[in-house]
A protein has these predicted regions:
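Phosphate/NTP-binding elements of NTP-utilizing enzymes
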Residues: 1-176
Length: 176
């Protein structure tokens, strides 16, 4: 059993195509991000998402752990249901993604072939030539909007032939 506060319940029940959450510290934005990630990777097997953060280091040390702890609470186990930062080993017998990443270093991969790429804004071009199915953007107040618009929004265009009927396909969750 998991407790959600009123603001979290409101956002989780809305489940909009595009959602923006501007909230103070301690609201529990990680649960909102984790729920969106779960909806997208489970309902779009083999999909490729993007998790945008100011820097990879900040994402891996501060942001991602608060999101992944919710997946753990919901029964998803690291190195069984998802793998962070490396290619899943063959003995897991996972499905393959529709588009296999060339580099697994900044990815979260899931048992059904879905992959979520950590997209860093500390270098330009980190989302160039990607075809993404959804975006989760954290720490929006630190995100360079021009870079986001010119690089990452353009990449949120993938796999229309597979997922066009899923309402969250090409959706965005923005938190700050």
């Amino acid at each position: 059993r998991q407790y959600f506060n009123d603001a979290q319940l409101y956002m989780l029940n809305m489940d909009c195509h595009d959602e923006v959450v501007v909230a103070g510290r301690g609201l529990g934005k990680g649960a909102i991000q984790a729920r969106r990630l779960q909806s997208c990777f489970q309902c779009m097997p083999g999909s490729m998402g993007g998790f945008v953060a100011p820097s990879v280091k900040r994402c891996l040390t501060n942001i991602l752990p608060s999101m992944l702890i919710h997946l753990e609470r919901w029964g998803f186990k690291r190195d069984i249901h998802y793998v962070v930062g490396k290619k899943p080993w063959k003995k897991l017998h996972w499905k393959s993604p529709i588009f296999t990443p060339a580099n697994w270093e900044n990815t979260i991969s899931f048992y059904n072939g879905s992959v979520c790429n950590v997209i860093s804004q500390d270098r330009s071009g980190t989302s160039n030539s990607m075809s993404l199915d959804y975006l989760i953007i954290d720490e929006a107040k630190f995100i360079n909007f021009e870079q986001l618009k010119d690089e990452t929004f353009q990449a949120n265009r993938g796999n229309e032939m597979y997922f066009s009927s899923f309402p969250l396909h090409h959706g965005m969750t923005i938190t700050s």
